[in-house]
Amino acid sequence: MLWGLVVPMILYAARMVEILARPDIPFDSLYTYLPLARQLLEDFSKMFSQPESYKVAPGAVIYMALAGADPVAVKTANLAISLAALALTFDTARRIGGRVAAVAAGWLYALPHMLVEAGATLMGESPFVFLVALWLWATSCAAQARTGRRAAAVQTATVVLAGLALTCATLTRATYMYWLPFAAIVCLALATRMQGPARSAALRIAAIHVIAAALVGAYIVRQNETFGRPMVATGSGAALYFGTNPVLSGYEPPFFGLAHDESTVSDGLGHLSLEGDRRLMEVAKTMLRELPAKALMKMYVRKLGAVLFFSRAHLDRHVLNDRAWRVVLVLLSILGLWGARRHAMGWVVGGAAAYQCAVHVPVMYNPRYSISALDVLLVLLAAQGIAWIWSRQRRHAAAACCVAFLGAGIALGSYHQRHSRALLADFHQIPAVAIAVAADKDLHAQGWDSNPFDAAARMTTNTATVDWTPEQPLPQDMITMVHLGMTRFEGQCRRVWLTQRKEGATRSTSISLEGLRQGQDINWGIHHVQLPEGGKSWHVQLRFECSPGTLMQFEGMGLYQASAGRYFRQKALAPKE
């Protein structure tokens, strides 16, 4: 108990302090969650009848309202429920796989950075993770066979608690909404083929999901009666719209230096308004119909890899980064699935993990969604994997093989991060619209043995620059990209710096080019380098950092927009507007 739970809890709390001490408040909490929580405190009866209430799932708002809508109080509550989630995960692992699994779960929860960040950040992740941990713990209690006079009462209580926890988790983040009926039906179907304690456990797990499905369904019916739409909250339209955008590989736009372009569809209504959400959903459905199946599947495979192992778009370059921890958790989870295959909870946790992967692939990629959805589940499964290794007769040999296997996985993940295809916007599926095209006389290339705009040229040193200085300032927008066409490329580049200068003011951003391939253009948003409008002078520079001798040939430079909303809007909305 001391080394398996108490010490990990102390370590976890100590690691949370730095994040809890940050004075900044995330955008969504500052402008959505906290204001709604204050409205809830002012007038509870009217809050859920106002249009603002459908913009987010109610769980996070109620949680922050219970803390007085005070950021310090919410962070304090985050610390408390995060430690409780760790303890619940510890005991759930013990009930499934014994003491070794419990100790492993405690350390696997506390050591990686992901759940520390999710638990401490002032957002909806912390209550969601806690409620998922509570649901899994109560379900593990309900799945256990009990004897004695109070057995029926205890099992009934844990079934009800698990159902309520799963309901609250779904109303905090609605990702489990489709899981509820699916799991209930599967458990009922399996129960018809089972006998004895296994059948009873399957029926109790089915009852948990029936309770949650009924309560969440009642809330959805209430939303339909109040606002005319069956939903937990809006936001699914934007999530699918950005997640299907082939220009950005389904990633959130800031990963490419862009702002969100939902206004091209919502016309200022807001992506969380009923009409804005409907429009974005229609455009997303049109994209799914129009995009080639091969391109869509290729994007989904890449996103599945990002959901499981994170993306190079936000990973640091250390070998033991978040991807390394995910590799460890996923590989150990595979062993854990095998080790817990005869326990009902092994199927519940494994099924939930597979489901969460599936529902997060089509929607907008952001690592915090993956962390809150998967990490508790993976910790539980990975703990079972360690317990399974420990139970082998030749445990030391099994452990050595496992360590070697994990090391190889980490090395492969690190290699992929450094050498996979560079993450740049792609104009192949959606034609880009030119905002301004650079004239030849306004372009100046330096650092190559000849002009790369005329013919293929090699870099003479490890840096080279392309400067664009138009005669007049050019129009800019937060969804505009700098485009540098590249028809030839051979060699290796580390990064390119995008810099904008205007009358003495300068802003720049670094773009990773590791893994740049022949056929890729340099496309990057100017949102992070925008300067105030006005003035006469305007200058854009791309400064490459590549190996000497790298061969490049360019084909024009300019400002372009490749908005999926503008391109698909007419097909999706014209008959309905």
Language model region names:
Residues 3-4, 86-111, 129-130, 150-152, ...:
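Transmembrane-helix signature of polytopic, membrane-embedded enzymes
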Residues 76-97, 134, 138, 331-335:
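Transmembrane-helix motifs of polytopic, lipid-linked glycan transferases
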Residues 105-106, 110, 155-173, 214-217, ...:
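Membrane-interface alpha helices of multi-pass inner-membrane proteins
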Residues 227, 231-303:
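Membrane-proximal stem/loop segments at transmembrane-domain junctions that anchor or position
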